[in-house]
């Protein structure tokens, strides 16, 4: 994100229709033409004197000075015909993306004037259609026509023009009621109030008041060398199914029939749905024949998880987690992924679980900490840690060492860890999160760092503030190499960790996740440990018909609870 520079900023304002330009006809609002002519009469949208002096065309307007040395000029491109946004489809949004592509080199940014009813769908669709976007695209509209005495349209449109003209925010955004949202994170939440949109799971990219506040850390970074790519081959045979208590399996079956290729299924709470066998069977049959189903919560905030058995059942039926995506974003993403040519079904499913345009926050994504080597920060830290001779310097160094050691271990930076050792640092100290460097290295799967720390004699069974051991973190991260090193050094799961493993083992068995079961066994867990309902992983696998898992577990029945071998000789099926 950067502040736009230059004496003039040229924008293209694409008017598709919507309430902002509507007029009353026979007592109802219908799309109204001639928006540029209306804006020309409003001094806040057009400096007639400056336009006359510049000899601007009729469709190009100029805002009053936005700053001392900068003017924002904008050309209004009116679609023919105009649309009520309720009539918009993927085809119209593809045309809109292609319009932006045609004019991409002529303008510094783009404002799309769109009806509010489907604006969140439009913003989500455009975010996936426009790849490698390096200019600002903002959708806006109004709840009341702009020519009305009391209208939100004037503030919304002016705010969108100012944001697109003054800042380079290389995303598809939505501006409404003084807030700039990431487009694929926004949803409409009110039919009448001016604060019609919100971004339930991500803070606004910017807020406008007496000052403009940009949340710079949220703005996505782009590759400055990549050119804009417009994806026009969006799959149109996708749908949205909202579950409700008691929904008949026959209704679900009817909905999931061809030619449907993908479904966003809105579920209860954190991704839960009815666990009736006939309904789960319909979902399983559909996913096994290649239908892609994405699970999104119908709650406004929060994410889909498998904390509950009902959510686990959805995953077991082949339904893909939508994490914290809005339904609008999930539908757009599904359309985009299924529309890409030449991809296997497995690759498409994998793409749906990845963050492609900032549309979701996968729970596996952890904060990345930079390496302490090879950068300016590393040089400054090395200098700071080498300070001695004063009480203040020693106190500062001692306070920083635990966090720096954990950062180095998390990055797998053995050289930085060795540098800390040479300065006399204790690599067994805990950081502000209550974790040791061994926790950080185990979580990241860094075998070299783990080896180095074990050679330094750190406590292999140390617990963090949550009671987690490095071994448990390695199991959760599925790092068999690290698990083997820790086990050889005497690591073991605690009684609490083993007791809580039962439910997780059942979840893995239900999902036919052999890799997950193997790392637990390698860590010394009893795979016969029952879950919260008293059933074991073997019982769950048998009930789910996961024969490979059943065979694996039965092969271990004679050695349940025994010491697991090293990772090189894990049992297979």
Curated annotation (Swiss-Prot):
SUPFAM superfamilies linked: Ankyrin repeat (SSF48403), Glutaminase/Asparaginase (SSF53774)
InterPro entries attached to this UniProt entry: Ankyrin_rpt, Ankyrin_rpt-contain_sf, AsnA_fam, Asp/glu_Ase-like_sf, Asparaginase/glutaminase-like, Asparaginase/glutaminase_AS2, Asparaginase_C, L-asparaginase_C
Residues covered by the Asparaginase/glutaminase domain: 9-355
Segments for region (Asparaginase): 41-350
Catalytic activity: a 1-acyl-sn-glycero-3-phosphocholine + H2O = sn-glycerol 3-phosphocholine + a fatty acid + H(+); L-asparagine + H2O = L-aspartate + NH4(+); a 1-O-alkyl-2-acetyl-sn-glycero-3-phosphocholine + H2O = a 1-O-alkyl-sn-glycero-3-phosphocholine + acetate + H(+); 1-hexadecanoyl-sn-glycero-3-phosphocholine + H2O = sn-glycerol 3-phosphocholine + hexadecanoate + H(+)
Chain positions of ANK repeats: 141-170, 399-429, 433-462, 466-495, 533-562
NCBIfam families referenced in this protein's UniProt entry, alphabetically: asnASE_I
Protein family per UniProt: In the N-terminal section; belongs to the asparaginase 1 family.
Protein name in UniProt: 60 kDa lysophospholipase
Origin species: Homo sapiens (Human)
Name of the encoding gene: ASPG
């Amino acid at each position: 994100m950067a502040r736009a520079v230059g004496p003039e900023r040229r924008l293209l304002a694409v008017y598709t229709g919507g309430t902002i330009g509507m007029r009353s006809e026979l007592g109802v609002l219908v799309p109204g033409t001639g928006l540029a002519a209306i804006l020309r009469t409003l001094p806040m949208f057009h400096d007639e004197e400056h336009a006359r002096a510049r000899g601007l065309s009729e469709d190009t307007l100029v805002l009053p000075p936005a700053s001392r040395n900068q003017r924002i000029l904008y050309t209004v491109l009116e679609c023919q015909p105009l649309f009520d946004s309720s009539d918009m489809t993927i085809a119209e949004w593809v045309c809109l993306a292609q319009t932006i592509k045609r004019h991409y080199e002529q303008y510094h940014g783009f404002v799309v004037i769109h009806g509010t009813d489907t604006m969140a769908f439009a913003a989500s669709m455009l975010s996936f259609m426009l790849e490698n976007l390096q200019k600002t695209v903002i959708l806006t509209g109004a709840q009341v026509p702009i020519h009305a005495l009391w209208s939100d349209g004037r503030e919304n449109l002016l705010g969108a023009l100012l944001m697109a003209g003054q800042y380079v925010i290389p995303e598809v955004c939505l501006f409404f009621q003084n807030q700039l949202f990431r487009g694929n994170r926004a949803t409409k939440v009110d039919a009448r109030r001016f604060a019609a949109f919100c971004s339930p799971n991500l803070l606004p990219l910017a807020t406008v008041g007496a000052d403009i506040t940009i949340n710079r850390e949220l703005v996505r970074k782009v590759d400055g060398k990549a050119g804009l790519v417009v994806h026009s081959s969006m799959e149109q045979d996708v749908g949205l199914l909202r579950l409700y208590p008691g929904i008949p399996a026959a209704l679900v079956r009817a909905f999931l029939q061809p030619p449907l290729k993908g479904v966003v299924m809105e579920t209860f709470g954190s991704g839960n749905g009815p666990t009736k066998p006939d309904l789960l069977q319909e979902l399983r049959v559909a996913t096994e024949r290649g239908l892609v189903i994405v699970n999104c919560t119908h709650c406004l905030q929060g994410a889909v998880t498998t904390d509950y058995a009902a959510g686990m059942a959805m995953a077991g039926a082949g339904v893909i987690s939508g994490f914290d995506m809005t339904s609008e974003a999930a539908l757009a993403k599904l359309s985009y992924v299924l529309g890409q040519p030449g991809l296997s079904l497995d690759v498409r499913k994998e793409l749906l679980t990845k963050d492609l345009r900032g549309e979701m926050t996968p729970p596996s994504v952890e904060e990345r900490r930079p390496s302490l080597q090879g950068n300016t920060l590393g040089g400054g830290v090395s200098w700071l840690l080498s300070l001695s001779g004063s009480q203040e310097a020693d106190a500062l160094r001692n306070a920083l060492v635990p966090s720096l050691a954990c950062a180095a271990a998390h990055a797998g930076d053995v050289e930085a860890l060795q540098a800390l050792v040479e300065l006399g640092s204790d690599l067994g100290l805990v950081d502000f999160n209550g974790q040791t460097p061994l926790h950080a290295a185990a979580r990241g799967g860094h075998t070299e760092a783990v080896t180095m720390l074990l050679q330094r004699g750190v406590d292999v069974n140390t617990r963090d503030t949550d009671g987690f051991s490095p071994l448990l973190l390695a199991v959760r991260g599925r790092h068999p190499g690290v698990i083997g090193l820790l086990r050889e050094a005497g690591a073991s799961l605690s009684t609490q960790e083993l007791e809580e493993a039962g439910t997780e083992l059942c979840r893995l068995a239900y999902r036919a996740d052999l890799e997950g079961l193997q790392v637990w066994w390698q860590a010394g867990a009893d795979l016969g440990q029952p879950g919260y309902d008293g059933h074991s992983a073997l019982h769950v696998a048998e009930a789910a018909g996961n024969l490979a898992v059943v065979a694996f577990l039965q092969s271990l029945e004679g050695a349940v609870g025994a010491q697991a071998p090293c990772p090189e000789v894990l049992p297979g099926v």
